[in-house]
Amino acid sequence: MITVKPGSVVFENVRKTFGAFTAIPDLSLTIEPGTLVTLLGPSGCGKTTTLRMLAGLEHPNSGRILIGGKDVTMLPANERDVSMVFQSYALFPHMSALDNVAYGLQSSGLKKAEAREKAEEGLKLVGLAGMGHRLPAELSGGQQQRVAVARALVLEPQVLLLDEPLSNLDARLRRRVRTDIRELQQRIGFTAVYVTHDQDEALAVSDRIIVMKEGEIAQSGAPRELYEAPASSFIADFMGEANVVPCEVVSQTGDESLVRVGTMEHRVRSRGPRSGSAKLAVRPGAITIGAAGGSGMPGRVLHTAYLGGHIEYEVETEVGTLFIIDHEMNHTQRETSDVTLNFKNRGIALIDA
């Protein structure tokens, strides 16, 4: 039986350089046992370097890395209680799915019969029972990915590392496999550190998302928190599309601020004391569009696009051009027509100017 003892992950003031380039200046983070945490960010943000240091494929210049409370900072990869699922899956093409899964077990000293029995259990765990005889070339991309996950899980690691595991799959298959990964993680309860640059992927699978920028943590939190309450324009724009517009904080009562956007006023939740100039991050779906002359912000439609399930608008306003997604589609506004815009209560965040 496969039993996983999830471990915690701690980075304490970790620094990593490559020659004169500082990839990670000073990183501290904690990942609780049994959670799936995604390192998210654009190319070059340091997420892959962080994962490689956790795996033991790179070593920091300073600081400490702990897995399950044990200092592993300078331990080689083969002495760390982690398993990694690579972007390319790294399956042996001449070996069956069963032999691929059993390979690591046999390499660690388990007898062949025991290794194969446990490998069969691993394949069953990921929904591939009865397919162990197939070669990788006889499996779909999603099935190959599940073989790679099974191979990692049968080693019963404290932490499972996933490096862009869905990047080689088409869009429809990515949705299916990310659901499989999330369901498997919740069912077994292993600790997982997941690296991706895909915001939708991160939102779908994560207990917590750590957004990185230039080797530092830009913001960390639950998926909904990062999407609905971004701390900066970088987070707002990176976690899905957002209109970032200037505003003025008129007054504040508790955790709610009254802001003026152009000639329109709107109440929005805020973090801590606010006054003076600021910015609003407004999701495209948080703007309603109606006929001209109503109460709200006046605008003029520049472009429209019908996409089946919604209509997209670009509307020129006194605070700039706003991108709007209308899912209700009660009335289609024509290009060049005058309209009135209003903000919904959700999908709007007050951020620093």
From Swiss-Prot:
ATP binds at G41, P42, S43, G44, C45, G46, K47, T48. Its main location: membrane. GO terms for cellular component: ATP-binding cassette (ABC) transporter complex. InterPro entries: AAA+_ATPase, ABC_SmlMolc_Importer, ABC_transporter-like_ATP-bd, ABC_transporter-like_CS, Mo/tungstate-bd_C_term_dom, P-loop_NTPase, Transp-assoc_OB_typ2. Signal peptide: none annotated. Keywords: ATP-binding, Cell inner membrane, Cell membrane, Ion transport, Iron, Iron transport, Membrane, Nucleotide-binding, Translocase, Transport. Residues 9-239 form the ABC transporter domain. Gene3D superfamilies: 2.40.50.100, P-loop containing nucleotide triphosphate hydrolases. The keyword Nucleotide-binding applies. It is an enzyme of class 7 (translocase). It is a peripheral membrane protein. One of its GO terms (molecular function) is ABC-type ferric iron transporter activity. It catalyses: Fe(3+)(out) + ATP + H2O = Fe(3+)(in) + ADP + phosphate + H(+). It is found in: Cell inner membrane. Its EC number is 7.2.2.7. It holds the Pfam family TOBE_2. The complex is composed of two ATP-binding proteins (FbpC), two transmembrane proteins (FbpB) and a solute-binding protein (FbpA). Belongs to the ABC transporter superfamily. Fe(3+) ion importer (TC 3.A.1.10) family. Part of the ABC transporter complex FbpABC involved in Fe(3+) ions import. Responsible for energy coupling to the transport system. This is Fe(3+) ions import ATP-binding protein FbpC. It comes from Agrobacterium fabrum (strain C58 / ATCC 33970) (Agrobacterium tumefaciens (strain C58)). The gene is fbpC.
